[in-house]
Amino acid sequence: YGTLISAALEDTVRVWDLSTGEDVGRLRGHTDTVKCVQVEDELCVSGSLDSTLRVWDLRRVDAFETACRARMEGDGQDVPEADDPCIRTLAGHSRGITALAFDHETLVSGAADKTLRQWDLETSQCVLTMDILWAMSNPSTSVDLRVPPESSAPLLDPLHGANQFAGPFSYPQPPYEDGSWEMYTDFVGSVQFWGFALASGSGDGGVRLWDLRTGQAHRTLLGHTAPITCLQFDDTHLISGSLDKTIRVWDLRSGHVLETLHYDYPVTALQFDSRK
């Protein structure tokens, strides 16, 4: 069946052989809980509360584990550095990383420092920083909060960057009187990108669409009353799940909620297939 990657409340990532159900390797290097992982072919990216991302080459796991066992058995050999599965360490966030999205050309992470970062995997450098609190305090970059009910606010088409329109949204109040969000450790609950469009869900209950070419938040979908924990979107719809016990289906063309699904418990994960 292939390979499975898992993370738990520990600082290692486990590699499983689904054909045998065996734990075949550990990805070691993080110094705090691993909060998110994603695999693309032979590469795995992990994000941790130690504020770093690590890129792993899964093809090196077997040789590295074999060398580790040999050293533990006392043959005196050191593990060659070239066999270490960790091929990149990305540092830049000031607090724990709680969400990531990754393909072979693009990596985006979200962290408790309330920023999103895009990374160059070749240089291990951050090439773009998107500040969620700045977007919240400058709503003209996303939605105009002064728009009357009969009016509409400009939005960004996720595929073509064209201006679309949607009705107004109400802005939620911070949980603390001083305006802070510190009660939400996982302030960024989910991120996903498609082309130049990036969607993020955060602790203020807002879903934002960003343009990766400019780093600007062009669109804000507000309606959830608790932190966003998960989301997924395609060319026409975005679906978000929240600790407010609801799943919302958004029309990306109009910005309106098409359907709200009520659940008995806080929603922590979702996936949809538009083909079914």
Language-model regions: role of each:
Residues 1-2, 41, 104, 195, ...:
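Conserved loop/turn motif of beta-propeller repeat scaffolds
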Residues 4-5, 44, 107, 198, ...:
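Hydrophobic beta-strand positions that form the internal "hydrophobic ladder"
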Residues 7, 23-29, 47, 63-72, ...:
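Short C-terminal beta-strands that terminate individual repeats in beta-propeller domains
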Residues 49, 54-73, 122-156:
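Internal, charge-rich low-complexity segments
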Residues 7-10, 47-52, 58, 110-115, ...:
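Conserved strand-to-loop turn within each blade of WD40 beta-propeller repeats
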Residues 18-21, 58-61, 121-124, 212-215, ...:
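Short loop/turn segments that connect beta-strands within beta-propeller blades
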Residues 32-38, 95-101, 137-159, 166-171, ...:
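Canonical WD40 repeat/beta-propeller blade segments in eukaryotic WD-repeat proteins
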